[in-house]
């Protein structure tokens, strides 16, 4: 973000003083192909100016005696933005970062261009990390916390570079000037980063998620022949994360090559990975660390599957409400099977889904 190091002027467009130095508003192109547009006073940047770097990023602010001072805006090549406080050309002081969609992803302090002090990292799903960063600006220490999307439930303890090593259930009681105050909850459950593999769903399959446990329960579904279903414990508004969908991680090829009977609890995570909750883990007596796989299908669902970065499970999907949901209401999602796969006459879906689809389409035509 500091482009002044060993930069050699290649071309100057604008007024020059008697010594041939940029003076007034000028555009200076450097040997690195970086470009600066702004005000100069006898060869030094003074006043508003903007760097255009070779990689597509930019840095804009107010220069005094050739150095950026005060508020500056660095725009990454992908469109993300860092708004920070500069002293003598380096980040020193409060800063905020935003992603390409304008969502806040970082809030904290910088010292000599490195994150410093208590910092917050925000995920698009609503969760966050908070704590005092180490000398390298990393979320490493004994007093770091992951805060769930309710901005209250937390896992507090030891993290290394943002990865939970040992967390205990806590409640975020208050935040004063960016500093959080946590209160540890009774109990001796310990949580740690436990990303599943193709063969291990969890090293502690019967340890429930504390956030999920407050919001959902499993009971007999109200949908005919659907078995168990997922229900809301509490009344919530729209866009609320209710449950998590963890499972073993397998490939799309593996899913596509086996019988539909084995794919009852599969959910695509991305182009490479499918999350699966196979036997015997579809029984809560064998696995209850996450319950999202218990949500049944509906063509008029009250929830959706959404991406989620979980402190324990890693990248997974969650179940998020589409609308307000009442206590004891069953949570449903659209399974999203392909209704018109190429080269096939009918949908690529299990038989029960095809039957329900025809019935639903019939009601829509009335």
From Swiss-Prot:
EC category: transferase
Domain notes: The SET domain is necessary but not sufficient for histone methyltransferase activity.
Annotated localization: Nucleus; Chromosome
Domain SET: 214-336
MORN repeat residue intervals: 36-58, 59-81, 106-128
CC annotations in GO: chromosome; nucleolus; nucleoplasm; nucleus
Protein name (Swiss-Prot/TrEMBL): Histone-lysine N-methyltransferase SETD7
Effect the entry attributes to changing residue 245 to A: Significantly reduces the monomethyltransferase activity but increases the dimethyltransferase activity
Cross-referenced Gene3D superfamilies: Histone H3 K4-specific methyltransferase SET7/9 N-terminal domain, SET domain
Main location: nucleus
Subunit composition and interactions: Interacts with IPF1/PDX-1.
Site positions (Histone H3K4 binding): 245, 256, 266, 317, 335
Enzyme nomenclature, EC number: 2.1.1.364
Effect of residue 220 to A: Increases near-attack conformations
């Amino acid at each position: 973000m500091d482009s002044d190091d060993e930069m050699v002027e290649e071309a100057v467009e604008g007024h020059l003083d008697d010594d041939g130095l940029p003076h007034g508003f000028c555009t200076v192109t450097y040997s690195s192909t970086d470009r600066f547009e702004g005000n100069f006073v006898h060869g030094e940047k003074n006043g508003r100016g903007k760097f255009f770097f070779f990689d597509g990023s930019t840095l804009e602010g107010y220069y005094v005696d050739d150095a950026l001072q005060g508020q500056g805006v660095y725009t990454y090549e992908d469109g993300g933005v860092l708004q920070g406080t500069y002293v003598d050309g380096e980040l020193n002081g409060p800063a905020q970062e935003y992603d390409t969609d304008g969502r806040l992803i970082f809030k904290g302090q910088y010292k000599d261009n490195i994150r410093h002090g208590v910092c917050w990292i925000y995920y698009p799903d609503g969760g966050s990390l908070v704590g005092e960063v180490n000398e390298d600006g990393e979320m490493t220490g004994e007093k770091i916390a992951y805060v769930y999307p309710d901005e209250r439930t937390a896992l507090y303890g030891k993290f290394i570079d943002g990865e939970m090593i040992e967390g205990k259930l806590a409640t975020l009681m208050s935040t004063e000037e960016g500093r959080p105050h946590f209160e540890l909850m009774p109990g001796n459950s310990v949580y740690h980063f436990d990303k599943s593999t193709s063969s291990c769903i969890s090293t502690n399959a019967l340890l429930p998620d504390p956030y999920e446990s407050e919001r959902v329960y499993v009971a007999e579904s109200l949908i005919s022949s659907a078995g168990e279903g997922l229900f809301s414990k509490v009344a919530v508004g729209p866009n609320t994360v209710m449950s998590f969908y963890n499972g073993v991680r397998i490939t799309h090829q593996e899913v596509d090559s086996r019988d539909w009977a084995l794919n009852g609890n599969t959910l695509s995570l991305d182009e490479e990975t499918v999350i699966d909750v196979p036997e015997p883990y579809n029984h809560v007596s064998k696995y209850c660390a996450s319950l999202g796989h218990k949500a049944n299908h509906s063509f008029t669902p009250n929830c959706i599957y959404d991406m989620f970065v979980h402190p324990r499970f890693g990248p997974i999907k969650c179940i998020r409400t589409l609308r307000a949901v009442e206590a004891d209401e069953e949570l449903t999602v659209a399974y999203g099977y392909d209704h018109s796969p190429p080269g096939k006459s009918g949908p690529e879906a299990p038989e029960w889904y095809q039957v329900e689809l025809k019935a639903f389409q019939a009601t829509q035509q009335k």
